[in-house]
Amino acid sequence: MEKNCYELQYPRDNLYLSCYVNESLNYRYHWHPAEYEFQIVLCGKQEFCRGKENFVMEEDDIVLVEPNAGHASFSTTLNTRTLVIRFSALAFKPFLKKGESFSFSGFPSGQKTRKGPRYTRIRFYAARLLDAASQASPYAPLAARGSAQLLLDP
């Protein structure tokens, strides 16, 4: 599978993003020191490990991984694809007191929650972000930034 990775930078807001569609294959444990990561299962099924948690993710499920949290996944069905969006933790710095960190709650989604309004909204803005990032239009960076900011609204 060809992987197009889109990198977006908004230095005035300390917002640095990357997004791509990934084929979930093998178990590769890793972490990101200064980035959050959303993973949205587009199709298929995968097992996901985040820290000491293990869970199964199905189509439309979303997980968020905080900075420095070890994580890995592997496909349990053929052709499992995920949308991965990583964004800088520094984007929240203006909103936090010294020594605080930003924390999202309610992740991962699951069978009872994946179709709820919060997760539907996240999938919508994530799709808009990927679409805008892939466009050559001079206005695409503006659309991508707006989608990213709405995506990050906890």
What are these regions (language model features)?
Residues A133-L150:
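All-alpha amphipathic helical-bundle segments outside canonical DNA-binding/catalytic cores
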Residues E37-I40, R121-R128, S147:
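Amphipathic, well-ordered alpha-helical segments in soluble domains
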Residues Q39, V63, L83:
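Conserved GNAT-family N-acetyltransferase fold
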Residues E2-L17, G70-Q135, D153-P154:
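A hydrophobic/aromatic-rich effector-binding and dimerization subdomain
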Residues M57-G70:
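Conserved metal-binding segment of the jelly-roll/cupin
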Residues M1-E58, S101-S103:
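Generic protein-terminus/edge-of-domain signal
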